[in-house]
Each structure stands twice: as C-alpha cells, then as structure tokens.
C-alpha cells in the first residue's frame, strides 16, 4: 500500500531515502520472491515509475480514501487464497518476518495474521479469502484494520525480531529517527 498523501511528511515520503534507497524500495526488497503476485497501489507517478523499473505491478489512481486503495488492490485477487497488506512506509520490515507471517498462515489458513512486537500488533497483515468481500466493501476512510477488529477472535500474531521493523515514516522527524538508528546499527557492525 503506497497511497498516502504525505501531508504530515510534507511531500511524497515513499521516495525519501533511507541509506541511499527510497523507502518503498526497501519494502519491495523485503517482499521479493515471497508472493505469487505483488501489486503496489499508489497515487504517485514517481512511485509507479520506480515500481515499473523494478518489475512490480502498479495500480495508479487518484482516489482519496484508504478504503479506495484497498478496493483497488483487491480488484484482481479472485482465486488467491490470501492477500497481504504491506505498508510502503515501513522500510525496516524484514523478509524474515514476512516469511514467518506466510508460513504461519499456511499452518492456519482461516485466521487473519499480523506481525507484532512484544504483543503490540502492526503491519503487514495477511487476510484469508473469507475476508475478501468485506475488504472490498470497507466503510469510507477505513482500511484492513477495520476487518481485523471486526474479527478479533480470528486474529493471530507473529512476533518480529525488533521494534524497528514496525516503525512507519509519517513525518520528516520519523525518517530522521530511522536514519539515526540505521547509522548506529552500521557503526556497531563496523566496529
């Protein structure tokens, strides 16, 4: 999901760089090879161009609300057993955590699966086919979390390795905090 307007960030945050790479590209790398199909839903031409260059399918739109983004992403998902919503502004999400989410869903395919850190749920979120009609008919302004909350008893979680995986970038300050974290991690590796 790459359709945020970036109002708090002051622009298109998904093309802002972390460690010399656009935020969305970090997320695309983390999903590489894990899904039968990867579709990025965005309202940003620059994001669409990058996705095309990386060989990722894109739905470019000018809709206003989160439910529109979900509906557009769900349009061609008939025949899929699950869909996974991955936020494009979580550049430190790891392939390992996403793979754990997918393998957990293979063991229990009727549950909604989401990642968490120390019991606090976050994204990505994996939805089984029985939720698809609800996802396509979300109330105005609502996202997949609305469906997960409506079926709390069917939500399961998979722990991520570290809290930084679930940090999303909403403001320039958020990005600065992540840059500081990444530089400190790099310093720790090189010493």
Where are these regions (language model features)?
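Short aromatic/basic micro-patch
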Residues: 17, 92, 126, 157, ...
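Conserved N-terminal catalytic core of the sugar/cofactor nucleotidyltransferase
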Residues: 25-84
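N-terminal glycine-rich phosphate-binding loop and ensuing alpha1 helix
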Residues: 1-43
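Conserved beta-loop-beta/alpha segment of the NTase-like Rossmann-fold superfamily
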Residues: 65-136
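Structural signal for short hydrophobic segments within the conserved structured cores
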Residues: 16, 39, 57-59, 156, ...
């Amino acid at each position: 999901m790459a359709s945020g307007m970036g109002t708090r960030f002051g622009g298109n945050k998904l093309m802002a760089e972390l460690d010399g790479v656009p935020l969305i590209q970090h997320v695309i790398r983390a999903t590489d090879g894990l899904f039968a199909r990867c579709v990025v839903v965005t309202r940003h031409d620059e994001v669409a161009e990058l996705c095309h260059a990386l060989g990722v399918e894109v739905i470019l739109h000018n809709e206003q609300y989160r439910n529109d983004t979900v509906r557009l992403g769900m349009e061609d998902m008939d025949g899929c057993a699950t869909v996974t919503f991955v936020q494009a502004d979580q550049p430190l999400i790891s392939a390992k955590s996403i793979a754990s989410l997918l393998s957990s869903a293979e063991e229990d395919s009727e549950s909604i699966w989401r990642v968490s850190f120390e019991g606090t749920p976050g994204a990505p979120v994996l939805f089984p086919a029985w939720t698809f009609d609800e996802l396509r008919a979300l109330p105005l302004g609502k996202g997949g979390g609305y469906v997960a909350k409506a079926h709390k008893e069917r939500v399961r979680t998979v722990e991520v390795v570290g809290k930084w995986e679930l940090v999303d970038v909403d403001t320039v300050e958020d990005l600065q905090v992540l840059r500081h974290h990444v530089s400190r991690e790099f310093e720790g590796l090189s010493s």
